[in-house]
Amino acid sequence: MIDLTPEMIEFTQRLEPIARPGGHGRVLMFMGAGRGTGASTLAREFARIAAARSKRGVWLFDLDHAKNPQRKILAPEGGQSFDASFGRTPFWDVEPATARARMVARKGGNKLYVTEFQRAPGEVKRLNLRPAPDYWRAVRSSIDLAVVDAPGMSRAVLALVADMDGVILIADERRPGTDAIEARRAAIEARGGIVAGVILNRGPDPARWAA
């Protein structure tokens, strides 16, 4: 396992403060600019390091609703679950509307929680993402930081970018694909999102950041 702690500590310091003045949290999305960029690993390590510095906790939202890989890594034993609705209409819905589904959070470490999407077998035919500004406002009021791990090759996640405080793109430094980065930046900005930065990730070597 690669220890990304020193690099992610530096990155969290660059994004200080983790929580905004007045007690309002932040919502940051990590998105790969292509396949195999390590975006999910960086999102998880960022959330873990940020949790150690937080007061009200950090939630890692895993948008891979089919496999829930982050929960399997951070909370492999399952354990107690918490409602992740924050008392608001969520950022997702299912078809048919009568299908039984919910999002919960499980404790993944000290002040760190990771989401898990649960569904009744065979009932959900389609899952959609949608803007939900009220939901994310409630998140900001309740916790210090939400880290949203978005599948980089999915266009569905663009429905959420306008509700984020920033989107951090992850690219492979060895083959960064400048055109792909710019295309993803344009798509995010066209939907009202803000690209807060680009991480050029190089596997076991230290990641490098660019504004």
Enumerate the predicted regions with their spans.
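Short acidic, gly/pro-rich beta-turn/loop elements at beta-sheet edges
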Residues: 40, 70-71, 208
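P-loop/Walker-type NTP enzyme "switch/lid" segment
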Residues: 13, 20-27, 31-35, 56-144
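A conditional alpha-helix N-cap/helix-loop micro-motif detector
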Residues: 4, 8, 40, 125-129, ...
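Conserved catalytic-core segment of NTP-binding enzymes
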Residues: 45, 128-211
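C-terminal lobe/tail of nucleotide-utilizing enzymes
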Residues: 1-27, 48, 79-83, 182-211
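A conserved segment at the C-terminal end of the G1
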Residues: 40-61
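Short, well-ordered coil/turn elements that cap or connect secondary structure elements
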Residues: 53-55, 109, 190-193
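Short, glycine-rich nucleotide/cofactor-binding loops
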Residues: 32-40, 173
